[in-house]
């Protein structure tokens, strides 16, 4: 468009200049022989020409301004660094080079102290499948706001068995946190039964989203150690690729997710094969929407293992334990609610030093095979739970299993002076009743016997009257108050 304007303006310019020259020449040539009237007319034409000459630049379009160069998005495509998307050749060096250039790219300030904001740089695996022979790591600590996504990583046959394909770690760093806001998304990581998939060490606000992690060795699929706020969501993890009922289930090993830090979350995630689904040894973690059918309890598997005796402070909500259960050591401040336990899956409270306080196991569903498996069990082989407080096991829906609770209600009919209600089949803890309420209803009109609570030992409540009476005793007991 600018070129066409220039082409149109140029003839106009030449015509005007020609007219102006002819008018001026004519005026100078004949001014001596002109009449006063003609001379005045010529002077007016000369004035008009000068005005046109003054405004002439406005009639001619200036040449177009060359477009300014716009920086392209900082997407580091690994194929351009020599990575082989077919998975036939080792792509480790090429991907490490892309990670190095992303790390050294322009920054947009800092996040936490010592961590450069890389402005949302992306390392794009371009939908390829890449053979990896050693861990993928950044050159050093100090990177943040970066995404790695969109492809498959497969461990080579000589990948170190004690390492992880992606490692966010730097043993030499003195920073409080070494990485921040690193996102791993849309990845399939095949560990080839060598090492693990992802290690997040002392990092802050890390996201692992929509990842499929499989064939990890007798180690961890994902390891989170120290740091804060690693969020694992919408992901699938399994040592062996199966959909349940696998003939080799007895031999499943390894741990799918190992949380050795605080303030992390695992949400909407499936764990389909491993000896332990989720191991937790840090406080203030949240597990929500987690489906574990990693290895049946009868084969030695555990869905979720809480190994932090004395200060648990974790929540398991709205999850699904499928033929595998939960183990908690000396739990203090633990919530398990809204969770479905299928196939005789149960909760085991394991005594290490005898502490259990602030535990809430409520509003869950348990479904079993009718073989007499208790929904909540105690392991007191090390020592008995002798420090019990604020424990509530109640309002659980039970089908085909034995209900256990810290709150129980019972009644007994009789004709005499003593009524005994045995709560051992229901109460969770042996020989522990902290609170009792009872009501005696006499069947005979006009009878007002004296009555009293005489004994609550061995989880049995005994009520006696001063005279024989026909009636019913209703009792409510609580172990957790």
Swiss-Prot record:
**Which segment of the chain is annotated as a signal peptide?**
1-27
User: What would be the name of the gene that encodes this protein?
Assistant: QRT3
Instruction: Alphabetically list the UniProt keywords.
Output: Cell wall, Cell wall biogenesis/degradation, Glycoprotein, Glycosidase, Hydrolase, Repeat, Secreted, Signal
- Record's function text: Polygalacturonase required for degrading the pollen mother cell wall during microspore development.
GO CC annotation: extracellular region
Q: What class of enzyme is it?
A: hydrolase
Report each PbH1 repeat as a residue range.
203-226, 261-282, 356-377
Q: What is its EC number?
A: 3.2.1.15
As annotated in Swiss-Prot or TrEMBL, what is the tissue specificity of this protein?
A: Expressed in the tapetum cells in the anthers and in the ovules of open flowers.
Q: Which SUPFAM superfamilies match?
A: Pectin lyase-like
Q: Name one GO biological process term.
A: microsporogenesis
InterPro entries associated with the record: Pectin_lyas_fold (IPR012334), Pectin_lyase_fold/virulence (IPR011050), QRT3-like (IPR039279)
User: Does Secreted appear among the keywords?
Assistant: yes
Q: Where in the cell is it found?
A: Secreted, Cell wall
Q: What family is this protein classified in?
A: Belongs to the glycosyl hydrolase 28 family.
Q: What happens when the gene is disrupted?
A: The mature pollen grains are arranged in a tetrad. A layer of material is frequently deposited on the surface of the distal region of the pollen grains.
Q: Which cysteines are joined by disulfide bonds?
A: none
Query: Which GO molecular function annotations are given, in alphabetical order?
Result: polygalacturonase activity
Positions annotated as glycosylated: 415, 455
Q: What is this protein called?
A: Polygalacturonase QRT3
The UniProt catalytic activity note for this protein reads: (1,4-alpha-D-galacturonosyl)n+m + H2O = (1,4-alpha-D-galacturonosyl)n + (1,4-alpha-D-galacturonosyl)m
């Amino acid at each position: 468009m600018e070129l066409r304007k220039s082409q149109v303006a140029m003839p106009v310019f030449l015509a005007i200049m020609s007219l102006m020259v002819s008018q001026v020449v004519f005026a100078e040539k004949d001014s001596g022989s002109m009449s006063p009237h003609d001379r005045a007319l010529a002077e007016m034409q000369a004035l008009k020409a000068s005005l046109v000459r003054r405004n002439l630049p406005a009639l001619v379009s200036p040449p177009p301004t060359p477009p300014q160069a716009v920086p392209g998005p900082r997407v580091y495509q690994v194929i351009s660094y020599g990575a082989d998307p077919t998975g036939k050749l080792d792509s480790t060096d090429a991907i490490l080079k892309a990670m190095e250039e992303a790390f050294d790219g322009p920054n947009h300030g800092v996040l936490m102290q010592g961590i450069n904001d890389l402005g949302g740089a992306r390392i794009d695996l371009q939908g390829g499948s890449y053979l990896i022979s050693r861990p993928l790591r950044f050159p050093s600590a100090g990177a943040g706001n970066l995404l790695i996504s969109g492809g498959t990583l497969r461990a080579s046959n000589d990948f170190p068995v004690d390492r992880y394909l992606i490692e966010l770690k730097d043993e030499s760093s003195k920073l409080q946190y070494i990485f921040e806001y690193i996102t791993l998304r849309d990845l399939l990581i095949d560990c080839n039964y060598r090492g693990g998939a992802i290690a997040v060490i002392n990092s802050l606000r890390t996201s692992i989203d929509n990842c499929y992690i499989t064939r990890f060795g007798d180690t961890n699929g994902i390891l989170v150690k120290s740091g804060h706020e690693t969020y694992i969501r919408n992901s699938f993890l399994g040592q062996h690729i199966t959909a349940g009922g696998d003939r080799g289930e007895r031999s499943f090993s390894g741990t799918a997710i190992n949380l050795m830090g605080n303030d992390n979350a695992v949400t909407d995630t499936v764990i389909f094969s491993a000896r332990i689904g989720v191991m937790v040894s840090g406080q203030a973690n949240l597990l929500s929407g987690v489906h574990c059918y990693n290895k049946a309890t009868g084969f030695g598997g555990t869905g979720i293992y809480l190994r932090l005796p004395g200060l648990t402070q974790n929540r398991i909500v709205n999850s699904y334990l499928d033929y595998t259960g939960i183990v908690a050591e000396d739990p203090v401040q633990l919530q398990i609610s809204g969770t479905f336990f299928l196939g005789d899956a149960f909760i085991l409270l394991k005594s290490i030093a005898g502490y259990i306080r602030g535990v809430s196991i409520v509003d869950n569903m348990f479904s079993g095979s009718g073989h007499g498996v208790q929904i909540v069990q105690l392991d007191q082989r090390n020592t008995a739970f002798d420090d019990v407080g604020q424990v509530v096991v109640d309002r659980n829906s039970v089908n085909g299993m034995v209900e256990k609770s810290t709150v129980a209600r019972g009644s007994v009919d009789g004709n005499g002076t003593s009524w005994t209600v045995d709560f051992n089949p229901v109460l969770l803890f042996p020989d522990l009743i902290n609170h009792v309420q009872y009501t005696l209803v006499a069947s005979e009109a006009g009878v007002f016997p004296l009555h009293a609570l005489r004994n609550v030992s061995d989880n049995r409540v005994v009520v006696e009257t001063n005279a024989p009476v026909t009636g019913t005793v209703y009792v409510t007991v609580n172990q957790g108050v």
